[in-house]
Amino acid sequence: MLFRSAASAEYVDVDEILKPKETEPLILVLDGVEDPRNLGAILRTAECAGTDGIIIPERRAVGLNDTVAKSSAGAIEFVKVAKVANLNRLIEKLKSKNIWVVGTSGDATMDYTEWDWTRPTALVLGAEGSGLHRLVAENCDVLVKIPMYGKIDSLNVSVAAGVVLFEAKRQRNLTTDN
């Protein structure tokens, strides 16, 4: 399989991701993900889960590059990716469009399965190791956690994306099947 190079990958404007659609939006926001293989895996997961797009910060985060393209296994062709200068302003914009902003944090009290993912939602995932920046976490409408049952206290960010996005997809499928 041939992978598109990052040179041919184009960012879209945030408003392209936020365009109204027939279904409630499910948007992924990444706060400082720096590993290109993680971003590639997240692109692949986001495409498979049917998200509307991914929004990343312009600084202190990996952008689209050849490693991301290869790690995405072709998903870079289909997922809309936008860059923004300020995630906190983005969160304000999302809220103004009645999109719930749900961050992930190991310190959260709500389990990710307790959130109603059928709502218009932007899922915010933090950087490898450090998680969400303090202001980003404070600006989220709600924080959820993925419970850990072993001795390690967190998942890789790309794995966490898969766990939560597919819970959102599961809940959305339940409402459309009824």
Protein language model regions, located:
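Post-transcriptional modification and biogenesis factors for structured RNAs
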Residues: 1-178
